Amino acid sequence: MKKFGNYILTAGLLLGMLAVPVQAEEVSESTVLKLREQPFLTAPDMAVMPKKFLYDSGIEIAYPEDGVKGIYLTENTAANPERVDELIGYLNSNDLNAMVIDIKNDHGHVTTDFNSDDAHIQKNTIPVISDINALMKRFEEEQVYPIARIVAFKDSLLAQEEPGMSFLNPDGSIWEYGNGELFINPFLKETWDYAVNVGIEAAKVGFKEVQFDYVRFPEVFSNDDNGLFYDMGEFADLDLTPTEKRVKAISDFVAYAREKLMPYGVEVSVDIFGYAATVSEASGIGQDFSAISNNVDVISSMIYPSHWGPGNFDLSAPDLYPYEV
């Protein structure tokens, strides 16, 4: 979790405008001491932005003092008040304090009615959670820290509706993952805005953290794109390799999401593959741990044993050795 201190801006501005000459006996001429590489005047960070400038959802839930420790709920579970109460009791009995809830699920449905102006949200909403405001009030009563899970680029629903926003096979059909799942294209700004707009709606009803999952290209790109056809949008003309373009697209999306969500006072988190933290970049899927970490508050690294291949950690089959992994 990133925490940021306050800065004395006046002194910083003064120093930033001065080039300070430093005299040394061995050097006969003045040397300019560079005090700072980056400009002092930048967009305000959420952590130092006065609260009065942040959107007020009306839901007051403090960030847990001892850190976030919680459980995951599907939209169907979250829609059941009796089950939610049972799970709140479970949290209270086990030193837990948070719930992650599917708000845009793995198929592509938005799971509650936000009355949003976004056309994709309107079209793809199935309001399984019929009263999101009542749920948020219940969380407020118990101080349960609510996290909205938003599946970003795995979206079979939108891919079927808008094939041009997905990846196409040479015969014009939509490329499918082995289990039939479809992805939308992270190169396209429209896919960014869809995920971010769902996040904004979640923040407005009271969620305190927006967690983006499937923030990546499909794994087919880990080897090659198998002759797929897809639009690179504004990344097409960049003087970068296809690998570099994928990494930039994912890193830029994360930065964009955090910027857009900043006025709503929420933490921004992402789920990434565990191995992405052990390599300089997972270039096939576009995940660069360092670049992503610069633009989020939280990273959930997926270290499941099944995500590691033969030979990782000197194990022939890591999935068979969960404790060693």
Region annotations inferred by a language model:
Residues V84-H109, K204-E209, V298:
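Catalytic domains of carbohydrate-active enzymes, especially glycoside hydrolases
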Residues N94-I129, S222-Y230:
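Aromatic-lined carbohydrate-binding/catalytic grooves of carbohydrate-active enzymes
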Residues N115, S156, E161-G164, K208-T243:
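Active-site-proximal loop/short-helix segments
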Residues I59-A78, F153-K204:
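Active-site-adjacent "subsite" loops/lids of carbohydrate-active enzymes
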Residues L18-E29:
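Sec-dependent signal peptide cleavage junction
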